[in-house]
């Protein structure tokens, strides 16, 4: 899946003056030159040639990380939440399994992309929960930083954009705030950091369009040099709705969202080392001493010190 650029005098995008393969936002008031609309490659519904342009709806539009009970909000606040908490059989099965296994001490839900290690809470500031818990979250996450190079971030303090209207119902929040389990969401693959223009993850501090373009250009250059099979130059294409357009750009799924295939094993090896260290940090049941004393025939007193 690539991008489509469609010529239109009403478009918000222009070809970059230094590199025509790059699309940049036009300046307000700029009316000179060629303009384009940019969409993900695909078809559209209810298009009458002028208005009512609507991309095809996803078949299910479910987001499992909005369907867990803790902090759940309905669809009118967050898309993908489902009809009610645990309405999806997959999330219900996960919750049931965890509840049935009280020996679980830690979980990690592994996402793409971004190159960060997120930890709860995501529904309130980190200062509102146990300081001991937060210190433990940071201490274990720093193991991940050593292995992966990813920064640990609290979800509420440093990741969400709107503290008054945040999305919730996430797996990690439910694990921690409902079940008392140490839980992380690891966003694997850090292309922006690799190209030297890392993302600013405090989402409340919006970066400029110039910084976004700088990172995009650097990412495109990196992909062309290191994974050229995941980039295509713009090529003419006849679209059934828009006529003559162009299709090209990144294969987003395997360049920015996930590592290119040749980089996948390296990321997985780093993540595996973190997960092993995470598991080794959990409490382990041991029997320190075990003694027996004969009380009478066929009766013994057994003493065990469990630590």
Please describe what each predicted stretch is.
Residues 1-295, 300-307:
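Metallocarboxypeptidase
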